[in-house]
Amino acid sequence: MAEIRVGKNETLDSALRRFKRSCQKAGVLAEARKHEYYEKPSVKRKKKSEAARKRKSFR
């Protein structure tokens, strides 16, 4: 989990923006969405294969 320390003269808005940015960099929301529901191993492999195929076609 992302953690920030609020400075003495820092507003709550700027602290919240920093927290959201650190969560985004850490990938907290993406990880939560990925584990939102169970995904069978065969489906995981299929998605991984499709992603690799898509990356390869861009080259």
Swiss-Prot record:
HAMAP family: Ribosomal_bS21 (MF_00358). InterPro entries: Ribosomal_bS21, Ribosomal_bS21_CS, Ribosomal_bS21_sf. Keywords: Ribonucleoprotein, Ribosomal protein. The lineage of its organism: Bacteria, Bacillati, Bacillota, Clostridia, Eubacteriales. It comes from the Bacteria. Residues 43-59 have a biased composition (Basic residues). GO terms for molecular function: structural constituent of ribosome. Residues 40-59 are annotated as: Disordered. Signal peptide: none annotated. This is Small ribosomal subunit protein bS21. It holds the Pfam family Ribosomal_S21. GO terms for biological process: translation.
